[in-house]
Amino acid sequence: MSAETPINVVGGGAWGTALANAAAGAGHPVTLWLRDAGAAAALQAQRENPRYLPGVPLHPAIRATGEAVDLAGARATLLVVPAQTVRGVLESLRGPLATAGPVILCAKGIERGSDSFMSAVAEQVLPSGTPVAVLSGPSFAIDVARGLPTAVTLAAADAGRAAALSALLSGPSFRLYHTDDVRGVEIGGAGKNVLAIACGIVAGRGLGESARAALIARAFAELMRFARPFGGRPETLMGLSGLGDLVLTASSPQSRNFAFGQRLGAGASPAEAAGGKLAEGAFTAAALAGLAAAKGIEMPVAAAVAAIVAGTASVDDVIAGLLARPLRGETD
Protein backbone atom coordinates (compact mmCIF):
# COMPACT_ATOMS: atom_id res chain seq x y z
CA MET A 1 0.00 0.00 0.00
CA SER A 2 1.10 3.57 -0.56
CA ALA A 3 2.36 5.81 2.20
CA GLU A 4 -0.93 7.70 1.87
CA THR A 5 -3.05 4.68 2.79
CA PRO A 6 -4.63 5.61 6.13
CA ILE A 7 -4.57 3.98 9.50
CA ASN A 8 -8.02 3.47 10.99
CA VAL A 9 -8.95 4.21 14.59
CA VAL A 10 -12.37 2.86 15.58
CA GLY A 11 -13.72 4.69 18.63
CA GLY A 12 -13.85 8.39 19.42
CA GLY A 13 -13.38 8.34 23.18
CA ALA A 14 -10.35 9.73 24.98
CA TRP A 15 -8.09 6.77 24.19
CA GLY A 16 -9.23 6.50 20.58
CA THR A 17 -8.66 10.20 19.99
CA ALA A 18 -5.26 10.01 21.68
CA LEU A 19 -4.15 7.05 19.56
CA ALA A 20 -5.39 8.82 16.43
CA ASN A 21 -3.20 11.79 17.35
CA ALA A 22 -0.26 9.45 17.98
CA ALA A 23 -0.67 7.65 14.64
CA ALA A 24 -0.96 10.97 12.82
CA GLY A 25 2.11 12.20 14.68
CA ALA A 26 3.98 9.16 13.37
CA GLY A 27 3.37 10.47 9.85
CA HIS A 28 0.20 8.69 8.74
CA PRO A 29 -3.17 9.91 7.52
CA VAL A 30 -5.77 8.66 10.00
CA THR A 31 -9.44 7.81 9.61
CA LEU A 32 -11.14 8.19 13.01
CA TRP A 33 -14.49 6.38 13.00
CA LEU A 34 -17.27 7.17 15.46
CA ARG A 35 -20.54 5.25 15.69
CA ASP A 36 -22.44 8.56 16.00
CA ALA A 37 -22.24 10.33 12.63
CA GLY A 38 -23.27 13.63 14.21
CA ALA A 39 -20.47 13.43 16.76
CA ALA A 40 -18.03 12.58 13.97
CA ALA A 41 -19.12 15.63 11.97
CA ALA A 42 -18.75 17.86 15.03
CA LEU A 43 -15.29 16.48 15.76
CA GLN A 44 -14.25 17.02 12.16
CA ALA A 45 -15.52 20.61 12.19
CA GLN A 46 -14.23 21.62 15.64
CA ARG A 47 -10.87 19.79 15.33
CA GLU A 48 -11.13 18.91 19.01
CA ASN A 49 -12.85 16.30 21.17
CA PRO A 50 -14.49 18.60 23.75
CA ARG A 51 -16.22 15.78 25.63
CA TYR A 52 -13.17 13.60 26.29
CA LEU A 53 -10.06 15.69 25.58
CA PRO A 54 -11.04 19.36 25.82
CA GLY A 55 -8.33 21.77 24.79
CA VAL A 56 -6.27 19.17 22.90
CA PRO A 57 -6.22 19.91 19.16
CA LEU A 58 -6.92 17.14 16.68
CA HIS A 59 -3.93 16.49 14.43
CA PRO A 60 -4.46 17.91 10.91
CA ALA A 61 -3.92 14.47 9.36
CA ILE A 62 -7.00 13.03 11.13
CA ARG A 63 -10.33 12.76 9.32
CA ALA A 64 -13.31 11.94 11.53
CA THR A 65 -16.18 10.02 9.97
CA GLY A 66 -19.31 8.11 10.89
CA GLU A 67 -19.39 6.09 7.66
CA ALA A 68 -18.24 2.48 8.04
CA VAL A 69 -17.39 2.26 4.34
CA ASP A 70 -14.56 4.73 4.97
CA LEU A 71 -12.70 2.06 6.94
CA ALA A 72 -12.02 -0.19 3.95
CA GLY A 73 -8.55 -0.34 2.44
CA ALA A 74 -6.46 0.74 5.43
CA ARG A 75 -2.93 -0.27 6.46
CA ALA A 76 -4.11 -1.22 9.95
CA THR A 77 -7.13 -0.70 12.19
CA LEU A 78 -6.92 0.15 15.88
CA LEU A 79 -10.08 -0.96 17.67
CA VAL A 80 -10.42 1.40 20.64
CA VAL A 81 -13.77 0.64 22.27
CA PRO A 82 -14.66 -0.71 25.75
CA ALA A 83 -13.89 -4.39 26.25
CA GLN A 84 -17.52 -5.39 26.73
CA THR A 85 -18.49 -3.85 23.37
CA VAL A 86 -15.66 -5.32 21.28
CA ARG A 87 -17.71 -8.26 19.98
CA GLY A 88 -20.65 -6.10 18.90
CA VAL A 89 -18.48 -3.51 17.17
CA LEU A 90 -16.49 -6.17 15.32
CA GLU A 91 -19.71 -7.85 14.18
CA SER A 92 -21.11 -4.56 12.89
CA LEU A 93 -17.90 -3.70 11.01
CA ARG A 94 -16.98 -7.19 9.82
CA GLY A 95 -17.39 -6.25 6.15
CA PRO A 96 -15.18 -3.16 5.91
CA LEU A 97 -12.62 -4.60 8.31
CA ALA A 98 -11.99 -7.49 5.91
CA THR A 99 -9.86 -5.09 3.82
CA ALA A 100 -8.68 -2.82 6.63
CA GLY A 101 -5.36 -4.46 7.47
CA PRO A 102 -4.42 -6.08 10.77
CA VAL A 103 -6.87 -5.37 13.60
CA ILE A 104 -5.11 -4.04 16.70
CA LEU A 105 -7.17 -4.48 19.87
CA CYS A 106 -6.68 -1.68 22.39
CA ALA A 107 -9.23 -2.64 25.07
CA LYS A 108 -8.02 -4.13 28.34
CA GLY A 109 -10.47 -6.64 29.72
CA ILE A 110 -12.13 -10.05 29.67
CA GLU A 111 -15.56 -10.47 28.08
CA ARG A 112 -18.29 -11.21 30.59
CA GLY A 113 -20.32 -14.33 29.94
CA SER A 114 -17.78 -16.02 27.67
CA ASP A 115 -14.73 -15.26 29.88
CA SER A 116 -12.84 -14.63 26.62
CA PHE A 117 -9.81 -12.43 26.17
CA MET A 118 -10.10 -9.81 23.44
CA SER A 119 -7.97 -11.67 20.89
CA ALA A 120 -10.21 -14.73 21.28
CA VAL A 121 -13.30 -12.58 20.72
CA ALA A 122 -11.77 -11.14 17.54
CA GLU A 123 -10.83 -14.57 16.23
CA GLN A 124 -14.40 -15.75 16.79
CA VAL A 125 -15.93 -12.83 14.89
CA LEU A 126 -13.52 -11.78 12.14
CA PRO A 127 -13.01 -13.72 8.89
CA SER A 128 -10.56 -16.59 9.26
CA GLY A 129 -6.98 -15.47 8.75
CA THR A 130 -7.54 -11.83 9.70
CA PRO A 131 -4.33 -10.71 11.44
CA VAL A 132 -4.97 -9.67 15.04
CA ALA A 133 -2.68 -7.81 17.44
CA VAL A 134 -3.00 -6.32 20.92
CA LEU A 135 -1.76 -2.95 22.19
CA SER A 136 -1.39 -2.38 25.93
CA GLY A 137 0.82 -0.65 28.46
CA PRO A 138 1.16 2.22 30.94
CA SER A 139 -0.52 5.16 29.25
CA PHE A 140 -3.01 7.88 30.06
CA ALA A 141 -4.91 9.25 27.08
CA ILE A 142 -4.18 12.87 27.94
CA ASP A 143 -0.42 12.23 27.96
CA VAL A 144 -0.46 10.47 24.59
CA ALA A 145 -2.77 13.08 23.04
CA ARG A 146 -0.44 15.87 24.12
CA GLY A 147 2.61 14.10 22.75
CA LEU A 148 4.22 13.40 26.12
CA PRO A 149 6.73 10.50 26.18
CA THR A 150 4.93 7.16 26.47
CA ALA A 151 5.96 3.53 25.86
CA VAL A 152 3.59 0.60 25.36
CA THR A 153 3.70 -2.98 24.10
CA LEU A 154 2.27 -4.40 20.88
CA ALA A 155 1.78 -8.16 20.68
CA ALA A 156 0.98 -10.41 17.74
CA ALA A 157 1.34 -14.18 17.38
CA ASP A 158 3.57 -13.55 14.35
CA ALA A 159 6.72 -11.91 15.73
CA GLY A 160 7.52 -10.30 12.39
CA ARG A 161 4.08 -8.71 12.19
CA ALA A 162 4.41 -7.45 15.76
CA ALA A 163 7.72 -5.79 14.90
CA ALA A 164 6.33 -4.26 11.69
CA LEU A 165 3.23 -2.84 13.38
CA SER A 166 5.32 -1.44 16.23
CA ALA A 167 7.55 0.34 13.73
CA LEU A 168 4.51 1.59 11.82
CA LEU A 169 2.89 3.22 14.86
CA SER A 170 5.94 4.46 16.75
CA GLY A 171 6.59 8.19 16.66
CA PRO A 172 8.86 10.77 18.29
CA SER A 173 7.18 10.46 21.70
CA PHE A 174 5.09 7.28 21.38
CA ARG A 175 7.26 4.16 21.45
CA LEU A 176 6.02 0.64 20.89
CA TYR A 177 7.94 -2.43 22.01
CA HIS A 178 6.91 -5.72 20.41
CA THR A 179 6.39 -9.31 21.51
CA ASP A 180 4.69 -12.48 20.31
CA ASP A 181 3.23 -13.16 23.78
CA VAL A 182 -0.33 -12.04 23.05
CA ARG A 183 -1.87 -13.74 26.07
CA GLY A 184 0.73 -12.37 28.48
CA VAL A 185 0.04 -8.82 27.31
CA GLU A 186 -3.73 -9.34 27.58
CA ILE A 187 -3.44 -10.75 31.09
CA GLY A 188 -1.37 -7.79 32.22
CA GLY A 189 -3.84 -5.28 30.82
CA ALA A 190 -7.00 -6.97 32.07
CA GLY A 191 -5.64 -8.04 35.43
CA LYS A 192 -4.09 -4.75 36.41
CA ASN A 193 -7.47 -3.00 36.04
CA VAL A 194 -8.95 -5.23 38.73
CA LEU A 195 -5.95 -4.90 41.02
CA ALA A 196 -5.87 -1.12 40.57
CA ILE A 197 -9.37 -1.03 42.07
CA ALA A 198 -7.95 -2.74 45.16
CA CYS A 199 -5.21 -0.12 45.42
CA GLY A 200 -7.81 2.61 45.11
CA ILE A 201 -9.79 1.05 47.95
CA VAL A 202 -6.68 1.15 50.15
CA ALA A 203 -6.20 4.83 49.32
CA GLY A 204 -9.86 5.66 49.88
CA ARG A 205 -9.81 3.91 53.23
CA GLY A 206 -6.75 5.94 54.26
CA LEU A 207 -4.63 2.87 54.98
CA GLY A 208 -1.39 4.58 53.97
CA GLU A 209 1.30 4.37 51.32
CA SER A 210 3.03 1.39 52.96
CA ALA A 211 -0.14 -0.67 52.63
CA ARG A 212 -0.55 0.35 49.01
CA ALA A 213 3.05 -0.58 48.18
CA ALA A 214 2.57 -3.98 49.79
CA LEU A 215 -0.67 -4.48 47.89
CA ILE A 216 0.93 -3.62 44.54
CA ALA A 217 3.65 -6.21 45.16
CA ARG A 218 1.21 -8.92 46.23
CA ALA A 219 -1.16 -8.05 43.38
CA PHE A 220 1.68 -8.43 40.91
CA ALA A 221 2.44 -11.86 42.37
CA GLU A 222 -1.19 -12.77 41.65
CA LEU A 223 -0.81 -11.71 38.02
CA MET A 224 2.30 -13.86 37.68
CA ARG A 225 0.49 -16.89 39.15
CA PHE A 226 -2.47 -16.34 36.85
CA ALA A 227 -0.40 -15.94 33.69
CA ARG A 228 1.49 -19.23 33.79
CA PRO A 229 -1.43 -21.67 33.29
CA PHE A 230 -2.83 -19.47 30.51
CA GLY A 231 0.42 -19.34 28.57
CA GLY A 232 1.61 -15.85 29.51
CA ARG A 233 5.36 -15.52 29.95
CA PRO A 234 6.83 -14.12 33.19
CA GLU A 235 9.09 -11.69 31.33
CA THR A 236 6.05 -10.18 29.62
CA LEU A 237 4.33 -9.57 32.96
CA MET A 238 7.51 -7.92 34.25
CA GLY A 239 7.46 -5.46 31.35
CA LEU A 240 5.41 -2.48 30.27
CA SER A 241 2.10 -4.29 29.80
CA GLY A 242 2.21 -5.94 33.22
CA LEU A 243 4.21 -4.33 36.01
CA GLY A 244 4.49 -0.99 34.20
CA ASP A 245 0.75 -0.66 33.70
CA LEU A 246 -0.03 -1.90 37.21
CA VAL A 247 2.26 0.68 38.82
CA LEU A 248 0.71 3.51 36.79
CA THR A 249 -2.94 2.65 37.31
CA ALA A 250 -2.51 1.60 40.94
CA SER A 251 -0.95 4.92 41.88
CA SER A 252 -2.93 7.69 40.22
CA PRO A 253 -6.48 9.05 40.50
CA GLN A 254 -6.25 9.69 36.74
CA SER A 255 -6.92 5.96 36.41
CA ARG A 256 -10.65 5.29 36.30
CA ASN A 257 -10.11 1.96 38.02
CA PHE A 258 -8.09 3.51 40.85
CA ALA A 259 -10.62 6.34 41.22
CA PHE A 260 -13.49 3.82 41.28
CA GLY A 261 -11.75 1.90 44.05
CA GLN A 262 -10.97 5.09 45.92
CA ARG A 263 -14.67 5.95 46.04
CA LEU A 264 -15.49 2.42 47.19
CA GLY A 265 -12.93 2.76 49.96
CA ALA A 266 -14.49 6.05 51.02
CA GLY A 267 -17.85 4.33 51.53
CA ALA A 268 -19.65 4.60 48.18
CA SER A 269 -21.68 1.71 46.83
CA PRO A 270 -20.47 0.16 43.54
CA ALA A 271 -23.16 2.08 41.63
CA GLU A 272 -22.29 5.35 43.35
CA ALA A 273 -18.57 4.76 42.85
CA ALA A 274 -19.02 4.22 39.11
CA GLY A 275 -20.66 7.62 38.75
CA GLY A 276 -21.56 6.93 35.14
CA LYS A 277 -17.91 6.48 34.13
CA LEU A 278 -16.38 3.32 32.73
CA ALA A 279 -14.01 1.37 34.96
CA GLU A 280 -13.10 -1.72 32.94
CA GLY A 281 -11.90 -3.55 36.04
CA ALA A 282 -15.39 -3.52 37.53
CA PHE A 283 -16.61 -5.63 34.60
CA THR A 284 -13.51 -7.83 34.44
CA ALA A 285 -13.27 -8.65 38.16
CA ALA A 286 -15.77 -11.52 38.22
CA ALA A 287 -14.37 -13.06 35.03
CA LEU A 288 -10.79 -12.87 36.31
CA ALA A 289 -11.70 -14.36 39.68
CA GLY A 290 -13.80 -17.06 38.02
CA LEU A 291 -11.06 -18.10 35.61
CA ALA A 292 -8.58 -18.24 38.49
CA ALA A 293 -10.90 -20.35 40.65
CA ALA A 294 -11.58 -22.77 37.79
CA LYS A 295 -7.87 -23.49 37.49
CA GLY A 296 -7.20 -23.48 41.22
CA ILE A 297 -5.10 -20.31 41.07
CA GLU A 298 -4.98 -18.41 44.35
CA MET A 299 -5.86 -14.74 43.74
CA PRO A 300 -7.25 -13.38 47.01
CA VAL A 301 -6.99 -9.72 46.02
CA ALA A 302 -8.81 -10.21 42.72
CA ALA A 303 -11.46 -12.34 44.44
CA ALA A 304 -11.92 -9.65 47.08
CA VAL A 305 -12.47 -6.97 44.44
CA ALA A 306 -14.98 -9.19 42.63
CA ALA A 307 -16.92 -9.69 45.88
CA ILE A 308 -16.98 -5.96 46.68
CA VAL A 309 -18.09 -5.02 43.15
CA ALA A 310 -20.81 -7.69 43.24
CA GLY A 311 -22.01 -6.39 46.61
CA THR A 312 -21.52 -9.74 48.35
CA ALA A 313 -18.85 -8.46 50.76
CA SER A 314 -18.11 -5.16 52.45
CA VAL A 315 -14.81 -3.32 52.18
CA ASP A 316 -14.16 -3.74 55.91
CA ASP A 317 -14.86 -7.48 55.87
CA VAL A 318 -12.59 -7.98 52.87
CA ILE A 319 -9.74 -6.01 54.44
CA ALA A 320 -10.10 -7.99 57.67
CA GLY A 321 -10.08 -11.24 55.73
CA LEU A 322 -6.94 -10.36 53.78
CA LEU A 323 -5.11 -9.30 56.94
CA ALA A 324 -6.09 -12.56 58.65
CA ARG A 325 -4.61 -14.80 55.95
CA PRO A 326 -1.94 -17.24 57.18
CA LEU A 327 1.66 -16.07 57.02
CA ARG A 328 3.68 -17.76 54.28
CA GLY A 329 6.90 -17.59 52.32
CA GLU A 330 6.95 -14.54 50.08
CA THR A 331 7.43 -16.52 46.88
CA ASP A 332 5.03 -19.37 47.77
From Swiss-Prot:
It is an enzyme of class 1 (oxidoreductase). Its EC number is 1.1.1.94. The keyword Calcium does not apply. GO terms for molecular function: glycerol-3-phosphate dehydrogenase [NAD(P)+] activity; NAD binding. One of its GO terms (cellular component) is cytosol. Signal peptide: none annotated. Pfam families: NAD_Gly3P_dh_C (PF07479), NAD_Gly3P_dh_N (PF01210). It is found in: Cytoplasm. This is Glycerol-3-phosphate dehydrogenase [NAD(P)+]. It comes from Methylobacterium radiotolerans (strain ATCC 27329 / DSM 1819 / JCM 2831 / NBRC 15690 / NCIMB 10815 / 0-1).
